[in-house]
């Protein structure tokens, strides 16, 4: 009999478009012509009433929801409402939050089936049984209630990603949003706080063609990060590299600004990395790719000289990278099964940053084992000294299935998603709260790029450690309730830096230049404006006379009477700062 299936991933924000529903739709459409599949584009910021209305509008017989730490609670409420309204509707859940918490999921949600592991094969098999009858225990990964309790299966294996997923349905749904793309599954490493490397098998034969093309036969994924006990057990499923390159080029022309690869370690194979990087650089240079940025998660210490030399030739802004340091503390890295040559990693990060053509993020995680407040501060200072474009401070999540959640090491964490650390034997709840405040300050002040000159000036004049400075800024921000406008934040930074002894004239000039470089309106808050408004008007008039047709220039007068202008004709593709130049304003 015909069946109507509705799939949703319940994204955390509208800009994020989960891949799982599209993977599953493709799998179902290809094998079950009697099933009509609809993807319901929902996110957790919608009201429960709206979520229910939009699901019911698709008139499903079966509802499938992917569970993650960001949507589990919202999904549970939605499922309870769906079942209250239409008890006969069959609800199937999957995803990591289902795979690794089977009993909890059945206890908390009135679901009919739970699929562990990859669903591309198991979902069509289960739907076939729902339509025609049969024993669901034969379906890989299928879990369900029985008269005796629960039938729990082992997770279904994951197939390699497929490029045909990204069809017209996917492109239409994209609609200018960030494009998430998967060209590999799994990870060759087994970090104790993560799931990606723990449940996959290797399929390296897909690299055959690119090995020959580069004369680099025999270079497999590098396992230097990983637990040395059993490296052969940790592997990756790759999309064929030529197929992956063609896909990335095609999506680069889809109209999106950013193509974000969700591959856990993009550069785990040097051969594959070289093929994809060189191919994208060539495509950009030949005009086959528009104004788009490709975002990769990398293990920076795996880059060798040849790969770094190639990356240095990339057009500015083509690539963005996220390097997960997590910590500089050796005991912490060891406790997390991360065996990293830190000196090499630091060198590689500096070499990536040197040409200023790649936007680089560095990640730190607070709450890891063996890491106290002092050693985290040292990690912060070490990471900050590398001058990444963004320094991201995260907090340990005790996700289901991770080694750190399963081990008994005295940590306390929130019982509800995202299961964030509350305290450990090494760091207190109060200290973690201070780090949360500092993280907010880092995100709004450092990572925004809006205060780069002022920040450098404050560190230079005060001699403060970056960690101490951002603890202070976080404390001041936390003491002030309410929303932060740009002007309010600028005032807070100005006041804090002034109290620390930064000379007023130098600080004002730095903040004026920062503002003009990052805000194309040219507006300055009153406390940064020159006291003589006529001097600013005179400077603007002088610039217009020297540059006919320039429109209304964004001009400011500095403390010494000199003038600067932001033309915004040149915005750096990596820093996104506009050009601010001095000129004679007399």
Regions found by a protein language model. Give the residues of each.
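A structural motif corresponding to the C-terminal lobe/cap of the Radical SAM core domain
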Residues: 2-3, 10, 59-60, 238-241, ...
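Glycine-rich beta-alpha loop elements in corrinoid/cobalamin-binding modules
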Residues: 4, 9, 20, 27-30, ...
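Short N-terminal binding/cap micro-motifs at the start of the first secondary-structure element
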Residues: 14-20
